[in-house]
């Protein structure tokens, strides 16, 4: 299956391609429905997103027991299976991230997941980030179901999902080869493997909308620089030859700059990566990269933050039919380009959530050319919270629960890219809009 990227949408003011929207402030039904939880005070363990002819389910699961590793993982899998059986259509788990407390548990984890899923094993990232709750493992997954959904596998590290004239490609579990030493060489090797995985699934980097990079020792020195800076240098060099959205311009459509992304620490000295790519022929597709009006774009940072600035957008939104999907990059307590509220986890958490709220709010969408659309914190289908220090977990969690409500959330201990930053948050939101105008056929 070969599809042209993003969709054929006319270039120019994106507002001109949307019509018939409800007036600002008009009531709209929520797209994201939160699942129940045994404890109503806790965040939901899953959310469902109805996309018309398909349903997506976001699973964010933590075991209640604290027994042996295998028992904790089996508890999660039993719970996931029960949730997916409740849906109105057969569901396929496509992409999952497993957060591990101990690297020694990964072989057992791989064995159990291999037995559980068999030939239907999803693309999987294994990340050495201890769950803040004290469990040995937590589990995030996306599942999809629907009459038109088709799943195609390209080995353990790439999978494609097609429905409604859209094709998504998930790549994950990617690591550098054995030879590379140092963050620059590790990142270069990983990106080459990511390119190969995308190619094997009949797509390429120009279609990528979201990336994740988990770097061991992210703030540790490496020569005269920090490992994160070296990772950024490699990414900038690799991306230099990639025209993100180039084929969009050839198709006379709107394009973005860099994908939304998370670059976060993990235990050890390794590197794990994954990405999401999008292909479609649909004429009503509009892709927009989002920047925060109160933050300097990461790719425009001063060289004092990194010799080569981080190449990612603060967020990426896809307007498709009557809904918008917004991927929120890893976000921290940064205003303009400077860290705020050093040493104060509560104020950093509030600032981080303020940044997310502002990024996907209607005013920012209007500034990007789309009026009367946007998302709120209640439109989030799931959230990940990375906490630098275990002792800050409960203070951070209390603020997240107050601001996010019952949105499914996983908390993991992970170093953030700057020593003074104590928390980083990412998420995905789905919000409604009226159908965009379709382009006249040639």
Predicted region positions:
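Short, polar/acidic, helix-capping and beta-turn segments at strand->helix junctions
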Residues: 2-442
């Amino acid at each position: 299956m070969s599809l042209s990227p993003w969709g054929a949408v006319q270039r120019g003011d994106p507002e001109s391609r949307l019509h018939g929207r409800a007036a600002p402030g008009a009531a709209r039904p929520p797209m994201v429905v939160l699942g129940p939880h045994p404890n109503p005070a806790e965040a939901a363990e899953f959310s469902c997103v109805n996309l018309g002819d398909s349903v997506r389910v976001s699973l964010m699961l933590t075991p209640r027991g604290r027994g042996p590793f295998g028992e904790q993982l089996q508890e999660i899998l039993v719970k996931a299976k029960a949730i997916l059986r409740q849906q109105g259509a057969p569901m396929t788990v496509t992409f999952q991230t497993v957060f591990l407390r101990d690297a020694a548990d990964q072989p057992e984890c791989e064995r159990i997941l291999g037995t559980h899923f068999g030939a239907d094993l999803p693309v999987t990232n294994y990340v050495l980030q201890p769950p803040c709750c004290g469990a040995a493992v937590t589990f995030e997954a996306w599942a999809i179901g629907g009459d038109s959904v088709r799943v195609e596998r390209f080995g353990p590290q790439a999978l494609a999902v097609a429905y409604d004239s859209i094709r998504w490609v998930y790549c994950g579990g990617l690591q550098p080869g054995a030879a590379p030493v140092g963050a620059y060489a590790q990142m270069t090797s990983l990106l080459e493997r990511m390119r190969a995985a995308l190619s094997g699934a009949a797509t390429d980097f120009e279609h990528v909308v979201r990336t994740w990079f988990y770097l061991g020792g992210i703030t540790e020195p490496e020569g005269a620089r920090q490992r994160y800076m070296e990772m950024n240098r490699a990414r900038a060099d690799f991306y230099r030859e990639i025209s993100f959205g180039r084929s969009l311009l050839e198709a006379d459509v709107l394009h973005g700059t860099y994908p939304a992304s998370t670059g976060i620490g993990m235990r050890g000295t390794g590197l794990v990566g994954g990405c999401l790519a999008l292909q479609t022929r649909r004429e009503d597709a509009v892709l927009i990269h989002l920047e925060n009006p109160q933050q300097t774009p990461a790719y425009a940072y001063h060289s004092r933050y990194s010799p080569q600035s981080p190449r990612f957008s603060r967020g990426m939104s896809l307007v498709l039919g009557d809904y918008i999907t917004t991927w929120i990059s890893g976000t921290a307590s940064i205003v303009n380009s400077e860290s705020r509220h050093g040493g104060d986890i509560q104020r950093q958490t509030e600032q981080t959530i303020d940044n997310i709220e502002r990024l996907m709010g209607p005013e920012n969408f209007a500034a990007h050319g789309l009026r009367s659309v946007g998302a709120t914190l209640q439109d989030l289908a799931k959230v990940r919270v990375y906490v630098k220090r275990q002792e800050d977990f409960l203070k951070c969690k209390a603020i997240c629960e107050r601001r996010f409500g019952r949105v499914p959330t996983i908390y993991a201990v992970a170093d953030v890219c700057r020593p003074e930053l104590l928390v980083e948050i990412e998420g995905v939101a789905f919000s409604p809009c009226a159908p965009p105008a379709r382009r006249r056929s040639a």
